[in-house]
Amino acid sequence: MERVDVAIVGGGPAGASAAHAAATGGADALVLEKGVPRADRDRLGPDSTDAAGILDYWVDIMGIHPDEFDDGVVQRELNRAEFRGPDEAATLTSTGIESSYDGFGYTFQRARFDDWLRDRAEDAGAEYRTGVSVRGVDTDLSVDPSDGPNGDAGPDGRGDPRHVVELASGESVGADFVVLADGPQRTVTNRVLDEYLPADAAASERLASRTANHIAYQEYRRVPEDVYEAVNDALVFWWGVMPGETAYPWIFPNDDRVCRIGLTMPIGLDIDEFDRDAYALLDPDDESIPQGGEYIRRLLEWQYGDEYDVEDDFPLVEDAGKRNGTETYPISSTRPIDSPTDAGVAVVGGAMGTTSAFHEGGDHVAVRTGAIAGELAAAGDMAPYNRRWKEAIGDEIVRNVTMADMVADYEPADWNRIIGAADAMLAAETGDGLLAQPYRSGWESVKLLLGYKWNKRRVMKDYVGIDESEYVY
């Protein structure tokens, strides 16, 4: 049986960062990635799907400055985010949070970003293996790696592993620590966590994909010159134009007049629960929630159809994305979870639920949680992980959870109201730096600001979906 210090299930930003940190710390680290083909990558790699944008202070959370990336990773430098409602609009030009990055943020090419993280891990000494599917993880809790060789020591002097990672090929990999980085689908994570949770509180039920995730869809389209000029340095979000909790479309700019035009929404919505006439992207005769591609077509027709032939003037870039210029993927819309660290297991990134349903940002916290887990695995003690990730990203998670909770039941009229009083809302979401004049938008702004602060205090006390105290060993 192959033997390593730390086995990492999944090779996205969290998994590759865990491998880099573990190898940098002197551990023998192995990434096991099933591998996904993409039109914009010439080798198998992780899924590499998201809206791919980073705000200024996320640079410091992630711990990687964009100057470190290879050419072509960063696509556009940003100076603002635009929030558009059915009839109102607001623009955010500063997050108000201190950062080592001078701009507002940047967009990036996700496959190149993931490839850079992979190369960095391999350069540090980790092995990154693709085309490998993990069936499960068997754990012997009686084995403590800190005890040194135990049982029958192998030729490398190491004893029995605490974990045996079973591969679909029938092969096995022994490891002292396991980092679960298999993303929001949690194909392996849920099965592993179920071993440490009561049957009536199983992770496979609480973190089931249809209830714990949103579905996202985006297209890579080359847009007309004047449209690109208007959005090439901005993130654009529309709120209150499609039904569902934290459901919204967006435009994120790439290079060469290419924009990623996408959306996210809950899974399994019933259109009969919504007023079709209230939403700009629904038609009165819709019999079901539109598919992602139809939503994008309607968005473009609504915004640009008076001036352009959308299909001719906004063509798909077929050599981009996963396939034919499009991609569909899940994003976590649940609260983050603690890990069963007494078993030498850490859950990181999307698998632990750090992605924000409010703005889909998640790569920065994936990199950071993976790096913490890899560092601790190399040190031989995973026990501090749950405390460490909260210290590193807790404030960010609380902001995201608070805003998602506050807008969960909003309808189009609510979005018009909140965007119309955006001074307080945007200030509250991004930090105290924008609160110099919190009341200038009137009573509506006061209500929003006070509501945010009250909800934030409530969320701070309970923002973890599965607490470490729930695990049974």
Predicted regions and their residues:
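Core beta-strand elements of the Rossmann-like FAD/NAD(P) dinucleotide-binding domain
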Residues: E2-V4, A168-F177, T341-G344
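Short beta-strand to alpha-helix junction loop
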Residues: G96-D119, E287-G292
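Predominantly flavin-linked oxidoreductase catalytic cores and closely associated redox partners
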Residues: E122-E307
